[in-house]
Amino acid sequence: MRLSSTNMDARKMLFAAILSICALSSKKILIYNEEMIVALCFIGFIIFSRKSLGTTFKVTLDGRIQAIQEELQQFPNPNEVVLLESNEQQRLLRISLRICGTVVESLPMARCAPKCEKTVQALLCRNLNVKLATLTNAISSRRIRFQDDLVTKFYTLVGKQFAYSCISKAERVEFIRESLVVLRMVRGGGFS
């Protein structure tokens, strides 16, 4: 069985590292303690895990991300709900403005001077602007509240996931990575 060049390079580097460690320790240049040994073992584990289990982690994470995205799609989109509400409010305001304009036009001119007509129009415009500002604030408030609710539920889910001691360390690391990906999407506005 022929080894690939990257495998051969990795083996050569490992062999060279072992030889240099042995040479340095025999000359008493490098002194080992428990922390150094643990750190070297950890680095070796990370390199081994990345090479041998990299695709397994990727497939598992992709599956979890897909499942989370499917669950998130079941929630109603707050932007659509607020947009429908704002369209309805605008339609009602237009109708009210038309009715008020008709009422003002139907008043006899003797009782309603041109100044009064301008005052009514100014009042209606001001009311319309206040409603529009309120609606804009409601949209942004609802969006922020939705994101905060989602983040809170995520933290709760993460806490419940770690509450059970039967979960392995690898599963915990995998779950943390998934959670971070989704939280970045939420905080960055990656989905609407």
From Swiss-Prot:
Cellular compartments per GO CC: mitochondrial membrane; proton-transporting ATP synthase complex
Membrane topology per record: Single-pass membrane protein
GO BP, sorted A to Z: proton motive force-driven ATP synthesis
Source taxon at top rank: Eukaryota
Keywords: ATP synthesis, CF(0), Hydrogen ion transport, Ion transport, Membrane, Mitochondrion, Transmembrane, Transmembrane helix, Transport
Membrane-crossing segments per the record: 29-49
Keyword Transmembrane among UniProt keywords: yes
InterPro entries assigned: ATP_synth_Bsub_B/MI25, MI25_plants
Translocase found in the keyword field: no
A Pfam family that the UniProt record links to this protein: Mt_ATP-synt_B
Molecular function via GO: proton transmembrane transporter activity
Compartments it resides in: Mitochondrion membrane
Broad class of the protein's primary localization: mitochondrion
Function of the molecule: This is one of the chains of the nonenzymatic component (CF(0) subunit) of the mitochondrial ATPase complex.
Similarity comment text for this entry: Belongs to the ATPase protein MI25 family.
Subunit structure and binding partners: F-type ATPases have 2 components, CF(1) - the catalytic core - and CF(0) - the membrane proton channel. CF(1) has five subunits: alpha(3), beta(3), gamma(1), delta(1), epsilon(1). CF(0) has three main subunits: a, b and c.
UniProt-recorded name of the protein: ATP synthase protein MI25
